[in-house]
Amino acid sequence: MARNKIALIGSGMIGGTLAHLAGLKELGDVVLFDIAEGTPQGKGLDIAESSPVDGFDAKFTGANDYVAIEGADVVIVTAGVPRKPGMSRDDLLGINLKVMEQVGAGIKKYAPEAFVICITNPLDAMVWALQKFSGLPAHKVVGMAGVLDSARFRYFLSEEFNVSVEDVTAFVLGGHGDSMVPLARYSTVAGIPLPDLVKMGWTSQDKLDKIIQRTRDGGAEIVGLLKTGSAFYAPAASAIQVAESYLKDKKRVLPVAAQLSGQYGVKDMYVGVPTVIGANGVERIIEIDLDKDEKAQFDKSVASVAGLCEACIGIAPSLK
C-alpha cells in the first residue's frame, strides 16, 4: 500500500516542524515546497538524516515548483510573512493574500483532491480566500486555529490547577485573533466544568478571567518573547493533529476554522467552531448553545472576521 503524500507549502519554522512531526508519526511521505531555493531541500535532507535515529520510514523531498505537490492527500499551508513584534495578524493581510492566490492556483492545478489545512495569518480571512482561489469544496479546506487556541487554554488551566493537560478539555470559538471566545462553561477538568471549579474554590473568577485573556494574547506573548518570529512548535503540532484525524479517519472532535452555512447564524464565512474531522474532511459542524454574553462575544468575533474578508475583496475583487 502506497504511503500518504503530505505537501507542506512554506518551509519556514512551522513548515520544518510539520515535516519532522509527520515523519515521527509516520503519516506519510513529505514534500516541502518553498520559493526559496535550497531551503526545502536542506530541511528535507536534514529531517531524512534523523530518520535512522528516530526509526521512521518516510521520504522527504524539497521543491521549488508546485508540480512536486501533485496528487497530495493533505496540503498544509504556512507560506506567507510571519508576525513580528508590534504587528497584528491583520497587518499581514495584503502581503499574505497575494501568497494565498498563488498557493490556491498551485493546489487547484496539482492537488485538487487534497484535504487542505491553512495556518497562514490572518487565519480566518486567509483560509476563506484560499478556498475561493483553489476552488476546492469547503469541507476539504479548514483553518488551523481552534486546536492551537484550545491547547493554549488547556495548558494554562493545567498550570493553574496543577493537573495533567490530558485531563483538561477546552473549547475556543470564533476568529483566531484578539476577539476569540474561550468558553469557560464548556471547558472542564476531569469532566468538571470550570464554573463549578470556581465554586469549589479551586480557583477564582479573577484568575480564570486572566487565563482567558492570556489565551487571547497567546500568540502575541510568544512574538514578544522571540522578537524575531512567531510560534511554530504548537501551531505545527495542532495542524498535524487535524491532518492525522483526516488521514486515519479518526473522527476527532476538533475546533477548526470551517465554512459555516447557517450554523451560529453565519453563512459563507470561515469561523472557528467544533467539528468532526474524518476521511471526508469536515464531516459535521457541532452547533453548541451559547448564552447571551457568549453569543455577543461570538458575534463580535464574526464581525471582526467579516471586516477582514471585506478588506480582502477590496484588494482582490475576484473573491466577491
Swiss-Prot record:
Its EC number is 1.1.1.37. InterPro entries: L-lactate/malate_DH, Lactate/malate_DH_C, Lactate/malate_DH_N, Lactate_DH/Glyco_Ohase_4_C, Malate_DH_type3, NAD(P)-bd_dom_sf. The active site is at 176 (proton acceptor). It comes from the Bacteria. SUPFAM superfamilies: LDH C-terminal domain-like (SSF56327), NAD(P)-binding Rossmann-fold domains (SSF51735). GO terms for biological process: lactate metabolic process; tricarboxylic acid cycle. Substrate binds at residues 83, 89, 121, 152. NAD(+) binds at residues 10-15, 34, 96, 119-121. Keywords: NAD, Oxidoreductase, Tricarboxylic acid cycle. GO terms for molecular function: L-lactate dehydrogenase activity; L-malate dehydrogenase (NAD+) activity. Belongs to the LDH/MDH superfamily. MDH type 3 family. Catalyzes the reversible oxidation of malate to oxaloacetate. This is Malate dehydrogenase.
